[in-house]
Design a protein with these regions (language model features):
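Primary mode marks residue(s) on the alpha4-beta5-alpha5 output face of response regulator receiver
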Residues: 26-239
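Boundary at the C-terminal end of the N-terminal hydrophobic targeting segment
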Residues: 17-21
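Bacterial N-terminal signal peptides
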Residues: 7-15
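Positively charged n-region of N-terminal signal peptides that target proteins for export
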Residues: 1-4
Length: 239
């Protein structure tokens, strides 16, 4: 969860986005949060789960297989860099590092291509390198759940969005952090009215839908886990 909070907050500050707004989402609700993250449930949304339909698991398996083939050439992270992927926050300690190709993100807002994930997911190695573990697919902010389900069955995978972000006014950036945080994805402010009153800039949705896939895993549930990179702070949300 710490990585999700930091990535979401800083992407919001940078103004990066795939689309415009959100549709048909289910709030995370009550869960274990890191210290100072008691307001996180107001800033994170998950797609609703759906009953497993005939063919859903097979479709998800096929997408995972396509993802595995697509990312296999990037076992060497240096090739990813050479091919236009950019490490997000390389100097910030994270459990999972996103190597993102923003051109792919733009294309994904228009069409889903399992062979072209927006981001490659790596774990840092003890020698300072990176180990390839998965990929991330994205979709536009306006995408309804029926579209997400068409891309990857919601009975198997859950997409997530970062929402209700209040950007702090200049000089109040320290209020992003701590148990009394007001702004950002840790903040107590989660409505436009309260954000404007505090002098902030409100963003209802930071950058659209995202879903992680870990195609090298043998367990189907682990392949579409929603909390592999969350240091155990999202217990109960694994698929």
């Amino acid at each position: 969860m710490r990585r999700v909070i930091l990535v979401g907050m800083l992407l919001g500050l940078a103004g990066v986005g795939w689309g415009q707004s959100a549709d048909s989402v289910a709030p995370m609700g009550s869960m274990s949060m890191p210290h100072g993250a008691g307001n996180m449930s107001a800033h994170m949304m998950l797609s609703a789960t759906r009953p497993l339909k005939p063919g859903d698991q097979e479709k998800a398996d096929a997408i995972a297989a396509a993802a595995k083939a697509a990312i296999a050439p990037y076992v060497d992270y240096k090739k990813a860099l050479a091919d236009g992927f950019v490490i997000f926050l390389p100097n910030v300690p994270q459990k999972i590092y996103h190597f993102t190709n923003y051109s792919r993100g733009i294309a994904a807002a228009r069409k889903f291509d399992p062979s072209m994930p927006t981001s490659l997911l790596y774990e840092k190695t003890t020698d300072g390198g990176y180990k390839l573990v998965g990929a991330m697919y994205t979709d536009r902010q306006r995408a309804p759940e029926v579209e997400l389900d068409e891309r990857i069955p919601l009975s198997v995978a859950r997409w997530h969005e970062h929402v209700n972000f209040c950007k702090a006014p200049a000089g109040q950036e320290t209020a992003y952090f701590g148990k009394d945080a007001k702004f950002g994805l840790l903040g107590s402010i989660s409505t436009e009215k309260d954000c404007v009153a505090a002098g902030g800039t409100f963003q209802p949705n930071l950058f659209g839908w995202m879903v992680h896939v870990y195609p090298f895993e043998m367990d189907r549930k682990a392949v579409w886990s929603v909390d592999r990179d969350d240091d155990g702070d999202m217990k109960g949300l694994k698929m």
